Curated annotation (Swiss-Prot):
This is Protein sip5. Residues 122-131, 528-538 have a biased composition (Polar residues). May negatively regulate the snf1 kinase. The modification Phosphoserine is found at residue 127. Residues 108-120, 543-554 have a biased composition (Basic and acidic residues). It comes from Schizosaccharomyces pombe (strain 972 / ATCC 24843). Keywords: Cytoplasm, Phosphoprotein. It is found in: Cytoplasm. Belongs to the SIP5 family.
Length: 554
């Protein structure tokens, strides 16, 4: 296996060396690196065309050139552009071309290898016997690059034997010509009022001239007789019948001898002329690429059709039911072929539209139900206090012990803020006009009771207060008056400023009622008093104790 790989590598190296040492009209058979991309053309076809002198060989392009340069300057610029290895090969080819003879290919390759290694190490004096003289090398290079021209596409200077376009007679080098090819297969351009092409109707348009945009681009080439001596290692069998071996090529044997060169712009050649080399000729695989692209497009279209049909067949259950119903009711579908893809797609879209409409209706019903539940929520909250009001009214109608209400009021009094308010209210009673009394108006009793309950800080919610106010309006005046008298005659009436003021103004209340004196206070409650004398009236603390005992006894 190792011997096989080594043998293949050796054959490839020999083929590469053979192509490198081949010289046609002072040019090479391989590109010189103007374009870094891999060659897309058929190399064998291009090399054969160059050997047949139907196409300009590959020359090393120069970045700059002037006709006024001396010979040494031209040689220096060319050798610098070629590099040491290609310069040695060129020198070897020029030396071998002096004899104008073609020897054995292997002997020439062996001689070229030895000459290349020798030329890289020797000095410029060239005093070694059998080596090419400096004068002849200079003459050969200056002859090849005499009257160099610039390529309008790559802007490099090449020898004057250019390719010329068949349509407009514009120069173009072989480096640029072999890169021009057809575009990739694509859909045709659609203009207005034209039907849309199918996905697999691909086309491959011929390459156009980069100068005049003429289709089916091609070039013509006429070799320069002055450069014929600078050819080396050419096989005479590869030359066409109308081209003589080098050294004997004459003007009469050229097929284009009757055409002035460079050609005139008015002279045009047909794309199928035998002297024209078209881009399709050096890129013969364009038909294969077009057919491959069409087959690939057909496969994609077929796969898409199968996928769509599969999705339609495996759609919703109601869609299948609708399809079956339509088929059963269709009088023209008895034993007939399956429906086309367009009809199935229309049914599928109709079913999707129905599903979307049903979903929209369902969403609207859900929104309406949620709105109704939101609106009914406050009415339920309002209706709850009604039952509470009824129960509260029943409690008010039933006679309750006086001490129960007193205990609730005493608990409210125990807070420091209530005691302070009680002291302030009692002081206002003592300093007020005791003789001024006023009969309590029965019509203002509900409002009065509501103010009393609010100021005594009863911990009731706002709905309960509103319910109590509504309830007071509905009870009998007798029960209201009775409850009010019980509150006014209670011993703790002086702790509430409103009850104390009502008690002071009432003419029916006994002035000797047991009212807690504001001058008395208890140290446990944290109340300081200016007068600590004993009084016959019980203090707030004593009354609270008695009330607690009564509550426990009850």
């Amino acid at each position: 296996m190792g011997n096989t790989i080594g043998k293949e590598r050796q054959e490839n190296d020999e083929e590469l060396i053979q192509h490198l040492v081949q010289l046609v009209d002072g040019g090479f058979l391989d590109p010189q690196g103007v374009y870094s991309s891999a060659p897309a053309y058929k190399t064998n076809i291009v090399r054969k065309l160059m050997l047949e002198r139907r196409l300009m060989p590959f020359y090393k392009g120069l970045d700059s050139y002037s006709k006024d340069w001396p010979a040494d300057k031209v040689v220096e610029v060319v050798e610098k552009a070629l590099g040491p290895h290609k310069s040695a090969l060129l020198h070897c080819a020029i030396r071998q071309s002096r004899s104008l003879s073609v020897g054995n290919t292997r002997s020439l390759k062996r001689d070229s290898r030895g000459s290349s290694d020798h030329l890289l190490t020797r000095n410029r004096s060239n005093s070694t016997p059998g080596s090419i003289s400096a004068d002849y090398r200079t003459t050969a290079i200056t002859t090849i690059y005499a009257n160099a021209m610039e390529c309008p596409i790559c802007f490099l200077y090449y020898p004057s034997n250019f390719n010329y376009t068949r349509c407009c007679a514009q120069p173009i080098c072989s480096e640029c010509f072999v890169e021009i090819r057809r575009a990739e297969p694509h859909l045709p351009t659609v203009h207005a009022n034209e039907p849309t092409p199918n996905e697999f109707d691909l086309i491959s348009e011929p390459a156009k001239c980069p100068y005049c945009m003429t289709e089916r681009f091609g070039v013509i080439y006429k070799p320069n007789p002055k450069l014929t001596p600078f050819s080396f290692n050419n096989n005479p069998d590869t030359l066409p019948s109308n081209i003589a071996p080098m050294g004997t090529l004459s003007k009469s044997s050229l097929p284009l001898h009757h055409i002035p060169w460079p050609p005139n712009q008015h002279i045009k050649f047909a794309h199928d002329d035998k002297n024209v080399v078209s881009t399709d000729f050096i890129h013969p695989d364009w038909q294969y690429k077009l057919e491959r692209a069409r087959r690939r497009a057909l496969r994609r279209a077929a796969n898409a059709t199968l996928l769509n049909s599969h999705l339609l067949e495996t759609g919703p259950a109601n869609a299948n039911a609708n399809h079956n119903t339509d088929l059963s009711h269709d009088p023209t579908s008895h034993g007939g072929p399956r429906r086309t893809l367009s009809s199935r797609r229309q049914h599928y879209l109709a079913n999707v539209e129905q599903l979307m409409l049903a979903e929209a209706i369902r969403q609207s019903l859900l929104d309406a139900q949620s709105n109704d539940s939101t609106n009914s929520l406050p009415s339920t909250e309002v209706s709850q206090p009604d039952s509470t009001n009824i129960s509260n009214e029943q409690e008010i109608v039933q006679p309750q012990p006086t001490h129960t209400t007193n205990v609730a009021l005493v608990e409210e009094i125990n807070r420091p803020d209530s005691v302070e308010s009680a002291i302030t209210a009692s002081s206002s009673i003592d300093t007020g006009n005791e003789n001024e009394t006023q009969e309590v108006n029965s019509d203002s009793l509900p409002q009065f009771v509501h103010q009393t309950m609010t100021q005594t800080n009863f911990q009731e919610s706002s709905p309960s207060v509103a319910a109590d106010e509504t309830r007071v309006h509905n009870v009998d005046e007798y029960i209201e008056q009775q409850d009010l008298d019980e509150l006014i005659h209670s011993p703790i009436a002086s702790t509430n400023p409103f009850l104390a003021d009502q008690f002071a103004r009432s003419e029916t209340v006994d002035l000797n009622a047991h009212i807690c004196s504001p001058a008395l206070s208890v140290s446990d409650d944290g109340v300081t008093a200016t007068n600590k004398t004993q009084s016959s009236f019980p203090s707030v603390y004593e009354h609270q104790l008695k009330s607690n005992e009564l509550e426990r006894g009850h």
